[in-house]
């Protein structure tokens, strides 16, 4: 089983890592190519391209200038400990044991506009480059064209080491990021957990809650060493429960109703 997550825009480089082990990202050459292009942009170009404020644009202009193809603990941090958004509040890697992080290293992958595909302990230098950004390169008009089938092939290398019901990809990523994966080329079926909350008289996906729940699901898989998707139906954290009637073989729906 491989679980894919989206990255986070919010980053934490202030909290010291609680584990010393780290690995190197696989697509450094590709990231370097993107950085070369990003360095040609002015802060105003970055603000326009990414629809961000001028202070954020200046911050990322400097990040691109400082970025190095050499990753060390002095200039980078393990990805799953650096990301700090809603998904990662749910995953809460800072409280996982070294053994749990080692397990996550084998089973969790993070999709990234700059880095392509990251393992949890891969070193990450700070950046901002969302997968949906229409940043053109020699490979095409946007980042989906830039990455092509590279991410899918990298996932297949991992999936092909699994067998039986354990050869499955659990999609805990957003639509924007999962578009970088080509399901028809995957060497395994895909199961997508969907989290809905009761609001306004019906169940609906509420972005903040759904992001956190996807992180909770990834943590649940890691902590319980879950190998087959059927076991995910027992997930029942923070009030969510599996809804068999709303689910099918490729979409597992979890719902909760808190108050009215």
Curated annotation (Swiss-Prot):
Disulfide bonds: none annotated. GO terms for biological process: response to hydroperoxide. This is UPF0246 protein Bcep1808_2308. It comes from Burkholderia vietnamiensis (strain G4 / LMG 22486) (Burkholderia cepacia (strain R1808)). One of its GO terms (cellular component) is cytosol. Signal peptide: none annotated. InterPro entries: YaaA. HAMAP family: UPF0246. PANTHER family: PEROXIDE STRESS RESISTANCE PROTEIN YAAA, PEROXIDE STRESS RESPONSE PROTEIN YAAA. Pfam families: H2O2_YaaD. Belongs to the UPF0246 family.
């Amino acid at each position: 089983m491989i679980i894919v997550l989206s990255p986070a825009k919010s980053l934490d480089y202030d909290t010291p890592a609680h584990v010393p082990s780290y690995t190197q990202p696989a697509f450094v050459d590709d990231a370097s190519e993107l950085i070369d292009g990003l360095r040609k942009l002015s802060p105003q170009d970055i603000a326009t391209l990414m629809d961000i404020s001028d202070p954020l644009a200046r911050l990322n202009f400097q990040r691109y200038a400082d970025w190095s193809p050499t990753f060390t603990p002095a200039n980078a941090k393990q990805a799953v400990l650096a990301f700090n958004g809603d998904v990662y509040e749910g995953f809460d890697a800072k409280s996982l044991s070294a053994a749990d992080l080692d397990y996550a290293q084998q089973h969790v992958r993070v999709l990234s506009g700059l880095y392509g595909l990251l393992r949890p302990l891969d070193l990450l230098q700070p950046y901002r480059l969302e997968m949906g950004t229409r940043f053109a390169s020699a490979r095409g008009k946007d980042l989906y064209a830039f990455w092509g089938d590279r991410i899918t092939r990298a996932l297949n290398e991992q999936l092909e080491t699994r067998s039986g019901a354990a050869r499955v990809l659990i999609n805990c990523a957003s639509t924007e990021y999962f578009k970088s994966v080509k399901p028809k080329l995957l060497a395994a079926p895909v199961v997508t957990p969907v989290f809905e909350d009761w609001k306004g008289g019906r169940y609906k996906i509420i972005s903040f809650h759904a992001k956190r729940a996807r992180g909770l699901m990834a943590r649940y898989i890691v902590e319980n060493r879950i190998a087959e998707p059927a076991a995910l139906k027992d997930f029942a954290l923070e009030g969510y429960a599996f809804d068999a009637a709303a689910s099918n073989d490729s979409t597992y729906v979890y719902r909760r109703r808190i108050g009215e």
